[in-house]
UniProtKB/Swiss-Prot annotation:
Alphabetized UniProt keyword annotations: Amino-acid biosynthesis, Aromatic amino acid biosynthesis, Lyase, Pyridoxal phosphate, Tryptophan biosynthesis
Cellular-component GO terms for this entry: cytoplasm
Coiled-coil region(s): none
Family to which this protein belongs: Belongs to the TrpB family.
Functional summary from the UniProt entry: The beta subunit is responsible for the synthesis of L-tryptophan from indole and L-serine.
Organism: Agrobacterium fabrum (strain C58 / ATCC 33970)
GO molecular function terms noted in the UniProt entry: tryptophan synthase activity
Residues with PTM N6-(pyridoxal phosphate)lysine: K99
UniProt-recorded name of the protein: Tryptophan synthase beta chain
E.C. number: 4.2.1.20
Pathway: Amino-acid biosynthesis; L-tryptophan biosynthesis; L-tryptophan from chorismate: step 5/5
Length: 406
């Protein structure tokens, strides 16, 4: 996976307790701690096992379709009139997003641990689809927890999961979004620790999940680095990616963290604006607390109760963020900014019409930030954006906001 980080590297974390500075850790029920420690031990062995790495690489090539292309967005670049814009085309992967990278790695771990049942949480449905896909590939039953709100707005992905043989359990608690789905998945896991593997989709949760998910997703940045050197003979000036829990972003950011001349920007969901509570900008407008087994930036009230938040994008509709992102924000290595729903919708339409690529609403947030920054940069500068998912799943949501019937 990653080349070994050097001393004083931004890539050296987490420590042995799973912490990135004050963030991360393992805040779990006593019944789960033995399982978490078993997972840690199995992960430590798998990282250095050539057979595990070879099987993962084989599946990446022949099942996922890696490497994903690096694409120069010529018409978008000309339209914006500034920096050259490149996309890392993760939406071309099998299942339509970056999520499959992590799911393949974790299902191989589940097999090593002798687990016979897979559970997962999902927001946009992309992780649910990827989890159901790998479960089908390896012949394991799969239960996907999905907030009832997301079930309604992501109907195509719900049907795909069912086609793949997964049981989709709508969660009506709270606002029926990703946070609530994750709560239910954790309850299931506590009840079924012996036979069940919890396949977490984002770079959050108790250690070792944030590290594991990052390392399985780092293939994005590793490939992009080599591809950029081949295409331009140098690294990009800026990398931009959308951040919900943060798996696609940490996947492209991590291999570049020690390249000091590469500016890195994470884009949070600004929803309907930061003045109220209808957003999911955990770093921009949140504060540190504990949720889903790790300490990180959260949207919470004065009593530490988690706020619900909002985003037009189901995949960014989460009131927290991966702990490594929290740390990268605090040390100033990565800049985190919000993009509003309407800006993401405008970016969605612009890319579709200029490049013939229909992006998911998640990377549309990153694209909106690209649209802001590229014109202010020189024509000799380069922006690399992670195009983390395709927009088929979002067509109904977008059509509703545009006042069109589909």
């Amino acid at each position: 996976m990653n080349d070994a980080p050097t001393p004083n590297s931004f890539r050296a974390g987490p420590d042995e307790d799973g912490r990135f500075g004050i963030y991360g850790g393992r805040f779990v029920a006593e019944t789960l701690m033995p399982l978490i420690l078993d997972l840690q031990a199995e992960w430590d062995k798998a990282k250095s096992d050539p057979e595990f790495q070879a099987e993962l690489k084989y599946l990446g090539t022949h099942y996922t379709g890696r490497p994903s292309p690096l694409y120069f967005a010529e018409r978008l670049t000309a339209e914006l009139g500034g920096a050259k814009i490149y996309f890392k085309r993760e939406e071309l992967n099998h299942t339509g997003s970056h999520k499959i990278n992590n799911c393949l790695g974790q299902i191989l771990l589940a097999k090593r641990m002798g687990k016979t049942r897979i559970i997962a949480e999902t927001g946009a449905g992309q992780h649910g689809v990827a989890s159901a896909t790998v479960a089908a590939r390896f012949g394991l039953p799969c239960v996907v927890y999905m907030g009832a709100t997301d079930v309604a707005r992501q109907a195509p992905n719900v049907f795909r999961m069912k086609l793949l043989g997964a049981e989709v359990k709508p969660v009506t608690a709270g606002h029926g979004t990703l946070k609530d789905a994750m709560n239910e998945a954790l309850r299931d896991w506590v009840t079924n620790v012996d036979d069940t593997y919890y396949l977490i989709g984002t770079a959050a949760g108790p250690h070792p999940y944030p590290e594991m998910v990052r390392d399985f997703q780092a293939v994005i940045g590793e490939e992009a680095k080599a591809q950029m050197l081949e295409a331009e003979g140098r690294l990009p000036d800026m990398i931009i990616a959308a951040v919900g829990g943060g798996s696609n972003a940490i996947g492209i950011f991590h291999p570049f963290l020690d390249d000091k001349n590469v500016r890195i920007v994470g884009v949070e969901a600004g929803g309907k604006g930061l003045s109220g509570e209808e957003h999911c900008a955990s770093i921009t407008a949140g504060s540190p607390g504990v949720l889903h087994g790790n300490r990180t930036y959260l949207l919470q009230d004065g009593d530490g109760q988690i706020k619900e938040g909002h985003s037009i994008s189901a995949g960014l509709d989460y009131p927290g963020i991966g702990p490594e992102h929290s740390w990268l924000n605090d040390i100033g290595r990565v800049e985190y900014v919000p993009i509003m729903d309407h800006e993401a919708l405008d970016a969605f339409q612009m890319l579709t019409r200029l490049e013939g690529i229909i992006p998911a609403l998640e990377p549309s947030h990153a694209l909106a930030e690209v649209i802001k920054r590229a014109p202010k940069m020189g024509k000799d500068e380069i922006i690399l954006m992670n195009l983390s998912g395709r927009g088929d799943k979002d067509v109904h949501t977008v059509s509703k906001f545009l006042g069109m019937d589909v």
